[in-house]
Amino acid sequence: MQKTARAGDFKSFLKRFFSIFFQTLFWSSAVLSSVYNISCRISAEGIQILSGDYESPKILSIVAESEKKITVSLSEEVNVIGLTLSRQSAVLSDASAPMSGGESGKDVFPASLYAACGVENLVPISIESEEGGRLIICNLAQPTEIGGRYVLYGEIEDKNGNTLTFSSPVIGFNPRAARVVFSEIQDRSTEKGGVEFIELYVLEPGNLSGLVISSANDGKDYDVCLPPVEVDAGDFVVVHLRNSGDGCISEYGDDLELSTAQGSSSSRDIWIVNTDSRLGSTQDVLLLEDSNRSLLIDAFLYTKNSKTQWMKAPLEEAARRAYESGVWKSGFSIDNAFKVAGDSMQCIFARKNLSALDSAAESGTLPAGGISVVPEDWERKTASSVTPGR
């Protein structure tokens, strides 16, 4: 009886096994037949794509609004999982740091991220959100240093659970931006070792941090961001757009005799690390912007007489911006630019109304915002009369 019972159990097991096996085989065949055709290649028929939101939220902008406020604008409503702000250490900025517990040379990641995670130089912040969660406001417990380098590290999540982890550089806000204007421009040098330069004149004292020089001929990738340097009214700052040879030393402190390269001035020299020409040889639109306030403060448009239109779309766009901002008063077409006559390959321009602007600054009558300018405020100079830094 025991053998019979065991035999019955085994038969019952086999019956259940084959029943499940054939049901599985049937449904598997049905599914596979809708996906595979006779050539065994995958067919689009029978494949169903499930709908849903699988994209991480996007950061539209990160802006230092003031010394104690940073805003993060986003593409959609998010929940902040965590945010930290840290001062980027000069020691760590160009190296890699080990993870906690990691051996030397192993488990390393960028030092800026190491600092931003709050391990070092942490700046305490409190977080608010506006615009339905699409704007994050970081209120800092202490002010950032003018021109200081910081890293904002964070993790955010949208309503569908999609997350984004990011690390972004932040430059310390400058509430005391110096009031400066273009004063002399050389698009190229005919002397051996000479380079292009843009000279700035300081109308009101302050710090240069956040001031940006751009050439529409060159593009945004080559914007010149001025360093955090204190300047006084009446100072000249010569920005050399190429470094060529020895002695190209930028003068960030009080010693203004460090720069000894060809074209160095007796005033403050700043050298841009670059070996290519920057300014347009036939036409260009130069803009000077205070990025701390998103304010255009000066502009200069020039073109060879032979040109009847802007040669690149970015030139026309920059010219339009200069005009619509109220800085370049005469218009934005090629006819409204400063005209360069003759066939000379070198263009040197000098501002003629510096004395009037200086007097207005001293008397407190200089208008707020950008300085209005027209082509007649400028003149062309010869190579023998170029005077960078004076």
Per-range role (PLM):
Residues 1-38:
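Sec-dependent bacterial lipoprotein signal peptides
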Residues 128-132, 228-233:
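Short proline/glycine- and polar residue-rich coil/turn motifs
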Residues 117-119, 215-225:
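Short beta-strand and strand-turn-strand segments in soluble, beta-rich domains
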Residues 70-74, 78-86, 135-162, 282:
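Extracytoplasmic/surface-exposed domains of secreted proteins
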Residues 77-125, 211-213:
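Short, surface-exposed alpha-helix to beta-strand junction/turn motifs within ectodomains of secreted
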Residues 37, 143-147, 228, 235-390:
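Solvent-exposed beta-edge/loop recognition patches
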